[in-house]
């Protein structure tokens, strides 16, 4: 009987858990999109910081951990690359992770970089960040674009 009750409970509540998960993934996707726009394109640390969780672990070896590390990066962009702009080409959300494929141009007219950002979120807030950055080459071994 207990086994039958467990199966019935699973059948009843599993769709609701999945719907919540899909809803949370959309919340996470939107949070990362707004965070990135404020931090990188608008260079507004205060607005971007609202999307950070109680901790912010930075896995890029060239960037410091925590909100202060992000604040320093945003200030660097604002000072050295005020015209920098990034276009988010695609976004994937999977559970508590959001992945962005980005074309970043620090200096207008340059080819820029292809970037993949990976964010981990908890309760809708960003708590970890990884990235991989590759310069867009002048020539390619194939006819495909990086984007």
Question: Where are the predicted features?
Answer:
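Short, low-complexity N-terminal intrinsically disordered segments enriched in polar/charged residues
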Residues: 15-50, 142-147
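Short, surface-exposed coil-to-beta transition loops
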Residues: 84-87, 111-117
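Low-complexity, intrinsically disordered terminal/linker segments enriched in charged
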Residues: 131-147
């Amino acid at each position: 009987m207990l086994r039958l009750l467990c199966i019935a409970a699973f059948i009843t509540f599993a769709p609701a858990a999945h719907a919540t998960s899909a809803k949370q993934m959309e919340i996470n996707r939107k949070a990362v999109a707004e965070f990135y726009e404020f931090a990188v394109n608008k260079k507004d640390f205060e607005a971007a910081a609202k999307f950070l969780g109680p901790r912010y672990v930075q896995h890029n070896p060239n960037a410091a951990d925590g909100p202060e590390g992000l604040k320093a990066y945003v200030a660097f962009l604002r000072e050295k690359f005020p015209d920098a702009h990034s276009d988010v080409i695609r976004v994937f959300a999977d559970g508590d992770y959001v992945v962005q494929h980005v074309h970043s141009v620090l200096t207008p007219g340059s080819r820029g970089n292809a970037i993949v950002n990976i964010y981990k979120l908890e309760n809708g807030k960003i708590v970890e960040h990884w990235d991989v950055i590759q310069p867009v080459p002048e020539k390619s071994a194939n006819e495909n674009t990086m984007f």
